[in-house]
Amino acid sequence: KPAFSSTKYDKDIAAFESADKANPPPQGALLFSGASSLRLWKTAARDFAPYPLINRGFGGSKTTEVLGYMDRIVLPYHPRVVVFHCGSNDINAGDTAEAVIARVTEYHRRLRAENPHAQLVLLSTTQAPSRRTKWAEMKKADEGFRALAAAHPEIRFVDINPALNLPDGEPRPDVYLKDNLHPSEAGYAAMLKVIRPAVDAAWQATEAAFKK
C-alpha cells in the first residue's frame, strides 16, 4: 500500500498535538473520531459526563484521512471507547460503500491490534437533506457497518437516522442547521438519545480491563 499522503489537515492535526503536549489527555478515555458532526458537538463533554472525553473530529474528513492520522490522533490515547462517525464525506465525493466499509474494517483492525480491549461505537452515515442523491449508497455503507458489528462483539452499530427522521423517513426539519448537512442543537439531542446507551454499554463491557 502506498504511504498516506495529505497536507490538507496538517494544521488541524498539529493543533491537536500541541494541545496534547500542553495538556496531556487521559489514557483510557472516550474518544470521538471522525468528521465535522463530531467536531461541532459543542455540548459533548457535558452530554457524555462523567466519561473523560477527547474530541478528535476534524471537518470535512474522509475515512482515508481518519485512517491516515490514526497514529497521531487515535492510537496514542489508548481509548477505552471510540465513537466513530465518518464515511458520508467519502460517498458524497463519489466513493463506493464497499471502499468505505473496507476502510472502517481496517480502522477497527488497527485499533484492536494496538489496544485489544478498546470498544467501538460505530455510527451510521447521516442521510442529510443536502445529500439526498447519495442516500442509497450511504444505506449500503450502513448495512456493511451493521454486518461488521454483528461479527465483532466489541463493535456496537448505532443507526442515528431514525432519531433524525420523521416516521415516514423524511428528515425532521428541526434537526439540521441551515446548510441541511450538520446537526442543530435539536439534532445533537436526538443523536445523544441513541448514542449514549451504546457508549454506556461499551464502557461497562471494559470495566475489568480498564480497572486501575
Regions found by a protein language model. Give the residues of each.
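Serine-esterase "nucleophile elbow" of acetyl-processing enzymes
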Residues: 1-78
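Alpha-helical cap/lid subdomain in secreted, periplasmic
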Residues: 46-51, 68-211
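Polar low-complexity intrinsically disordered regions
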Residues: 1, 211-212
